[in-house]
């Protein structure tokens, strides 16, 4: 086998490979003979079909198959010999062929050489927080509101009330699409509507008709409404006040806490909040570390890896549409390109961190991750056993553990400063509610 390597552009490589033509001819001949023994063709006894007949019927397909196998086999031998690491599947193009040699060209991308830089320049502000009694009480108050019942009242609407309204919106005297509704139920103070709408309903009684002026935010999702001043003609049809359940042992039973009453519920709430806080703190630090790693390191990315990641993201997006996806056109690649590039770059850089630090997934950490996740379910042990008996799920958890270990390795050289934060403020930012 003769091999020549050519760098065409960036990470793309072109191998010109020449092998003895006999490799193909012998394999084709053997395959035709084997097919002749197996073939069942009218007019011929089983096993007695002439090779010439088989060649006429199947020769072209057999030769194509054998040629593909020969190219694949010799390509693998060539990249091993040349110490090349393909980042995607090659494309094969048969070249010049004579009685002596068969030549073909393989074009593919290789992984970039990654040399980590600026690890000591990564800056991380590590938040620290804890769940206080006040945080637990605030969560209980939230749960009370979620389990509130409502009854009609004859008074002015106030924050926390539920209002049933009809409304018609207009801009410069013209109604706009989506700006009209009847018997619309709105919880005042929920932040569901644009700023000024809910507060504009407060202070009015059922039966009143009134107008409010509001301005759509500059980042509003509808392009034609961004920054526009609108007038809403509103009819308040009913005001309902919330009746909150008392906080006692009966309240605890609403959440499946049969034994231990209210105190047991508080323990469970604190445990769940602490788990969520720990996950959010980890995610915050991880994002900072990865952002710093990306800023300090520029590497060329194989297009094959980006295309593959785009397809993964596209499939995930389509799955979220459920049954509607079948009637939708394929989502364009450029919707996912930026995210795909980031994921590929992070993967390559973290791979080098793992390699440099000789990291391997820690089994204890893997089990701790599974146990933490399982604790959110009704039967944690069942979830743990499910993971431990599922090879694919276990590999996913090993990858998560290995990524955590890589982030921790980067933290050792990063510039880290601690900052105390409040639970509610931090979690609101983490969940996008701030």
Curated annotation (Swiss-Prot):
GO BP annotation list: 'de novo' cotranslational protein folding; cell division; chaperone-mediated protein folding; protein transport; protein unfolding
Subcellular location as annotated: Cytoplasm
- One Gene Ontology term, aspect cellular component: cytoplasm
Q: Which GO terms describe its molecular function?
A: peptidyl-prolyl cis-trans isomerase activity; protein folding chaperone; ribosome binding
Keyword NADP attached: no
Report the catalytic activity: [protein]-peptidylproline (omega=180) = [protein]-peptidylproline (omega=0)
Q: Where is the PPIase FKBP-type domain?
A: 160-245
What Pfam families does this protein's entry cite? FKBP_C, Trigger_C, Trigger_N
List its EC numbers.
5.2.1.8
**What UniProt keywords apply to this chain's record, in alphabetical order?**
Cell cycle, Cell division, Chaperone, Cytoplasm, Isomerase, Rotamase
Which NCBIfam families does the UniProt entry name for this protein? tig (TIGR00115)
UniProt lists the family membership as follows:
Belongs to the FKBP-type PPIase family. Tig subfamily.
Per its database record, what is this protein's job? Involved in protein export. Acts as a chaperone by maintaining the newly synthesized protein in an open conformation. Functions as a peptidyl-prolyl cis-trans isomerase.
Its domain comment says: Consists of 3 domains; the N-terminus binds the ribosome, the middle domain has PPIase activity, while the C-terminus has intrinsic chaperone activity on its own.
Q: Could you identify this protein by its name?
A: Trigger factor
Q: Which organism is it from?
A: Shewanella loihica (strain ATCC BAA-1088 / PV-4)
